[in-house]
Each structure stands twice: as structure tokens, then as C-alpha cells.
């Protein structure tokens, strides 16, 4: 037990070393104070320079003297024992062949690693609890056997049913014309023309809207080979904004059990852009803000807002 307490440290030299550190810090502070004050209290420039140099040299000598004193005392302090036994595990340090069987040092390393692992695991657990992915509170009571996932029925609807839904939506809105085509097989592509305001390319998989691109009424929506251009953006910032809002609307209108209602709701929302350049903002009452009309349409009331006014 006495070996554990004896760490071979000269306490008197240790106390003197602390005082030497304080003296060194004071002398270093005086050096910076001298540099901060500069040349003062002399009438002539030459006298100020000589006084400044002499004062600066004295402060540097003080720093050098205090540093040498601290180095001398550090050699007198001594080094503590490198072995810190942990109860019965301290017996492992008595192994005479430390290089061949370094059990004690490995045990200390494993102990430090375990503490770090526990600390980081606690941090990760706190972050994961803040970003919980549970969709309902009833998942804790489900059985261990997971139910087989049902295949989505939205993607396997017959093309005739899709054509009938699009045809009925086309008849609902006289100011909107919808042209349906299938250039790549069974997946439908819609070209929606809303009055003389804009054109919308809608890429569908069965009755699931996959992508929308909004362009101006006079912009070209076809590629060189005559197919609908589903990749290039509009040349006008106002229609780029409407494209972003349409993508947000696709995420809002989600009802997998009734896909026809989703398409009809989206087309109703899209039809509200018939007065894109005529309706004022419902909050600020202005027609233009930063050179743009109100490009946002509320998903429930279909009222017009500027992008910054809807916040």
C-alpha cells in the first residue's frame, strides 16, 4: 500500500515551481505591456528610442531568468510513478517480463477505450432519441414476426383506368387541356396547358405523379426528336419557382388508397395558377415583390402569396 502512495515527488520543489511559473507569467506580461506602451515620456525621438530599447531588454532578461529558474526547479520536482495499480489488477504490473506480456498496460488502454465508448454511445443515444423514426406509438407492442409488406396497388393499375381518370379530370376544367402520351411504354406523360399562362409536363407511373416541370406558355417543351423534354428547366425564374412549389405539392397530396383523388387534387391546385399574373398577394396586397408575382398557392384555400409572405 505504501508503494501506491509513494509517487517520488519533491513537494517543496513543486511549490517553488508553481511560484516560478507565476513569476514567468508576470515577466512575459511586462514584455507585452512594454510593446503596447511604446516610446513615451521623452522629449526627443532619440531619447525615446534608447529608453524603449533599454526597458525592453530588461524585460527580456527577466523572462530568460525566470525561464531558467523554472527549468531548474522542474528537474528537482521528479517524476511520478508510471504505474497506478487498480486494486487487484495492480498485481499484473509485477510481471517481470513486461515486454513479452504487457497485460497491465493493455488493461489500462482497454479501460480508457471502454470509457470513451460509453461516453460516445451516450451522445449517440441522445441524438437518435431526438430524431426518432417511429411512425406510431403502437409499434412497441407488435410481435417479433413482421407482417409481409403488401405490394402497392398504385403502380399496377391498368392503363385504361388511368386514361379514364385523366379524361374525367380534363372535362372538369374547361380552361385546362391535358394531352396524354406513352412514349416509353405503359408510363403516362401529360402535357397540361393552362390557358395562355403556362405549360406543365407531368411524368407519371400509373396514377402516381413522379415529376413535374413548369414552363411558360411560349416556351418549347419538346426535344429535337419530338419528345417531351422532362429534364430542362424553364428560362424564366417565375416558372422555376412554380416548379419548386409543384414539387412541394406532390409531397403534400398523398393518399395511396385513392390515387385518383390525389391526381384530381393536384390538378385543382395547379388550376389556381390561371391568374398567376393577375392575383395580388393575400398578405401584402402587392402584385410584384422582387420582380416576381405571387407564385405560392395555399394547398387548402388556393390563395396567392409571395414566397416570403407565406411564412
UniProtKB/Swiss-Prot annotation:
Gene Ontology biological-process annotations: positive regulation of transcription elongation by RNA polymerase II; positive regulation of transcription initiation by RNA polymerase II; protein ubiquitination; regulation of transcription by RNA polymerase II; RNA polymerase II preinitiation complex assembly; somatic stem cell population maintenance; transcription initiation at RNA polymerase II promoter
Outcome (variant: residue 242 to A): In NEDSCAC; uncertain significance
InterPro entries in the record: Mediator_Med27 (IPR021627)
Single GO molecular function: transcription coactivator activity
Keyword Transcription set for record: yes
This protein's UniProt keywords: Activator, Cataract, Intellectual disability, Methylation, Nucleus, Phosphoprotein, Transcription, Transcription regulation
Modification sites for Phosphoserine: 132
Compartments, record wording: Nucleus
Positions where N6-methyllysine occurs in the chain: 134
Gene Ontology cellular component list: core mediator complex; cytosol; mediator complex; nucleolus; nucleoplasm; nucleus; transcription regulator complex; ubiquitin ligase complex
PANTHER family assigned: 34 KDA TRANSCRIPTIONAL CO-ACTIVATOR-RELATED, MEDIATOR OF RNA POLYMERASE II TRANSCRIPTION SUBUNIT 27
Subunit structure: Component of the Mediator complex, which is composed of MED1, MED4, MED6, MED7, MED8, MED9, MED10, MED11, MED12, MED13, MED13L, MED14, MED15, MED16, MED17, MED18, MED19, MED20, MED21, MED22, MED23, MED24, MED25, MED26, MED27, MED29, MED30, MED31, CCNC, CDK8 and CDC2L6/CDK11. The MED12, MED13, CCNC and CDK8 subunits form a distinct module termed the CDK8 module. Mediator containing the CDK8 module is less active than Mediator lacking this module in supporting transcriptional activation.
Recorded disease: Neurodevelopmental disorder with spasticity, cataracts, and cerebellar hypoplasia: An autosomal recessive disorder characterized by global developmental delay, impaired intellectual development, and poor or absent speech. More severely affected individuals do not achieve independent ambulation, whereas others develop some speech and can walk, or show regression later in childhood. Additional features include axial hypotonia, peripheral spasticity, dystonia, cataracts, and seizures. Brain imaging usually shows cerebellar hypoplasia, thin corpus callosum, cerebral atrophy, and hypomyelination.
Protein family per UniProt: Belongs to the Mediator complex subunit 27 family.
Task performed by this protein: Component of the Mediator complex, a coactivator involved in the regulated transcription of nearly all RNA polymerase II-dependent genes. Mediator functions as a bridge to convey information from gene-specific regulatory proteins to the basal RNA polymerase II transcription machinery. Mediator is recruited to promoters by direct interactions with regulatory proteins and serves as a scaffold for the assembly of a functional preinitiation complex with RNA polymerase II and the general transcription factors.
Protein name: Mediator of RNA polymerase II transcription subunit 27
Organism this protein belongs to: Homo sapiens (Human)
Encoding gene per record: MED27
